[in-house]
From Swiss-Prot:
Keyword Protein transport tagged: yes
Family note: Belongs to the STXBP/unc-18/SEC1 family.
Species this protein is from: Mus musculus (Mouse)
GO biological process: cellular response to type II interferon; exocytosis; leukocyte mediated cytotoxicity; neutrophil degranulation; protein transport
Gene transcribed to yield this protein: Stxbp2
Name assigned to this protein: Syntaxin-binding protein 2
Tissue expression notes: Expressed in testis, intestine, kidney, rat adipose tissue and 3T3-L1 cells.
Length: 593
């Protein structure tokens, strides 16, 4: 399946703006990357695409490499001290350098001291190209981006890192600006009024975008483009969404199963012995794209239907399209192994999710939904939330993190509880060793303890939703309401103010990136989108239910708007609680901005 949306834009920018820009017929080149640039490349390009463009080998700059002095090298690197030193080292050897010449592409602006060091080194003689391509983010999905900076939550919210806050916000702003520039957007910027972070980040992004606009005056031009918006929200505006057990396929699988680096592992029972299979859950799999936002109750039904249709189209007979049946079909028709394996993977995945759900999760879901909504499935207001949660807290079979999720939802519903009540709840749940994790929600801006006992909830006003939903999936993320209000032009300007636009940057500053004289403008051949975009950035991580909302709102506008969403990193409930756990700890080894 060809890359979609954001992945296609970034893939094309790398192929056209980097590799093809220095390609010569009949000449092979070496491609050298560091870890961050390798993550960007592998998120949107296949190795076969790269090799088809005259690249003979792809190498890691931090690993030992055999010199190939007969070939020129393309370096795609993040502008860090470590990568720049490794680059300089490639051109220090005698009598020959590691490579014949260097075409250097930095993913972002190279700091002046490193730039000067490059100029003073022997490398300067071998440089044929030097560009900054401003691509400091990962296209995670067609409409989802990640800044690949999970450490930023700690740097922003841990009191021990208070001195790093400004630098961290500045680094995130630069990355967000490269996303807008890559999409050829110069959006109006809005933020949630209240928290300092959102306002500070919004102003910093505008300053960075103005520098890009000075360099590329056509940025954001087009009749519909003036309506594009960048919206910055903090995690405290919706701490509920990352806590809930979601029952849509992608969110449920990532919450309940052990999916590492988007890879699902499972045992297959073959003809003779069972073996482990590892499958990447990404947009190359069109079946995954079709199923990922469906409710689990519909997934198995849909896979079975699709499998039946496939079998009928190939004149295969099957009564019950299930996992066992699939292995028999495979025996008969090995030529369809690729397609049948895909169905098998998703049947396994759905089956796996349901096994976990039928264990302890099912009984938690209705409690969580009632607490999140503040009302039960019939719409009756919850009068005694304590009665709901005590059975869960006292149940020894419920894992600590699941108890904490329920506990935090209760605290959020009550807008904080008294110190005395909190201590009792923690004791009932037997989660004393996690008490600081629970209290750390305050570092994000949530209310955990309330001296008056219990406050009234200070939540954003929610939309009344009339569409039918499953009883255990009544909650919809706050950001979905906000997205809908933006595309309908009804978002409250007092609660979500625009950043006032300072005077345009004088053109004398525009040459900041043209330091090496042979700078080339990036003219990647991706067709720019004509309609407006809404780009949402959530400070502190984005939940998978929020990712789903971006696709749902885009679909509801029938393509008039494209909604993109992202953050420093993608959250699962476990990841969210792990992040909270660190916010009162003095940790060594967390990356500085």
């Amino acid at each position: 399946m060809a890359p979609l949306g954001l992945k296609a834009v970034v893939g094309e920018k790398i192929l056209s703006g980097v590799i093809r820009s220095v390609k010569k017929d009949g000449e092979w080149k070496v491609l050298i990357m560091d870890h961050p640039s390798m993550r960007i490349l592998s998120s949107c390009c296949k190795m076969s695409d790269i090799l088809a463009e005259g690249i003979t080998i792809v190498e890691d700059i931090n690993k030992r490499r055999e010199p190939i002095p007969s070939l020129e090298a393309i370096y795609l690197l993040s502008p860090t001290e470590k990568s720049v030193q490794a680059l300089i080292a490639d051109f220090q050897g005698t009598p020959t350098f590691t490579y014949k010449a260097a075409h250097i592409f930095f993913t972002d602006t190279c700091p002046e001291p490193l730039f000067s060091e490059l100029g003073r080194s022997r490398l300067a003689k071998a440089v044929k190209t030097l560009k900054e391509i401003h691509l400091a983010f990962l296209p995670y999905e067609a409409q989802v981006f990640s800044l690949d900076a999970p450490h930023s939550t700690y740097n922003l919210y841990c009191p021990f890192r208070a001195g790093e806050r400004g630098r961290q916000l500045d680094a995130l702003a630069q990355q967000i600006a490269t996303l807008c520039a890559t999409l050829q957007e110069y959006p109006s910027i809005r933020y949630r009024k209240g928290p300092e972070d959102t306002a500070q980040l919004a102003h910093a992004v505008l300053a960075k975008l103005n520098a890009f606009k000075a360099d590329t005056p056509s940025l954001g031009e087009g009749p519909e483009k003036t309506r594009s918006q960048l919206l910055i929200m903090d995690r405290a505006a919706d701490p509920v969404s990352p806590l809930l057990h979601e029952l849509t396929f992608q969110a449920m699988a990532y919450d309940l199963l052990d999916i590492e680096q988007d890879t699902y592992r499972y045992e297959t029972t073959g003809l003779s012995e069972s073996r482990e299979k590892a499958v990447l859950l990404d947009e190359d799999d069109d079946l995954w794209v079709e199923l990922r936002h469906m409710h689990i109750a519909d997934v198995s039904k849909k896979v079975t239907e699709l499998l039946k249709t496939f079998c009928e189209s190939k004149r295969l007979t099957t009564d019950k399209a299930n996992i066992k049946d699939l292995s028999h079909i495979l025996k008969k028709m090995p030529q369809y192994q690729k397609e049948l394996n895909k169905y098998s993977t998703h049947l396994h995945l759905a089956d796996d999710c349901m096994k976990h759900f039928k264990g302890s999760v099912e009984k938690l879901c209705s409690v969580e939904q009632d607490l999140a909504m503040g009302s039960d499935a019939e719409g009756e207001k919850i009068k005694d939330a304590m009665k709901l949660i005590v059975p869960v807290l006292l149940d020894a079979s419920v894992p600590p993190y699941d108890k904490i999720r329920v506990l935090l939802l209760y605290i959020l519903l009550r807008n904080g509880v008294s110190e005395e009540n909190l201590a009792k709840l923690i004791q009932h749940a037997n989660v004393q060793s996690y008490s600081s994790l629970i209290r750390n929600l305050e570092q994000l801006g949530g209310t955990v303890t309330n001296s008056a006992g219990s406050g009234t909830s200070s939540r954003l006003e929610r939309r009344e939703r009339m569409e039918p939903t499953y009883q255990l999936s009544r909650w919809s993320p706050v950001i979905k309401d906000v997205m809908e209000d933006v595309v309908e032009d009804r978002l409250d300007r007092k609660l979500w103010p625009f950043v006032s636009d300072p005077a345009p940057v004088p053109s004398s500053q525009a040459a900041v990136s043209a330091r090496f004289g042979h700078w080339h403008k990036n003219k990647a051949g991706v067709e720019a989108r004509a309609g407006p975009r809404l780009i949402v950035y959530i400070v502190g991580g984005v939940a998978m239910s929020e990712m789903r909302a971006a696709y749902e709102v885009t679909r509801a506008t029938e393509g008039k708007w494209e909604v993109l969403i992202g953050s420093s990193h993608i959250l699962t409930p476990t990841r969210f609680l792990d992040d909270l756990k660190t916010l009162d700890q003095k940790l060594e080894g967390v990356a500085l901005p």
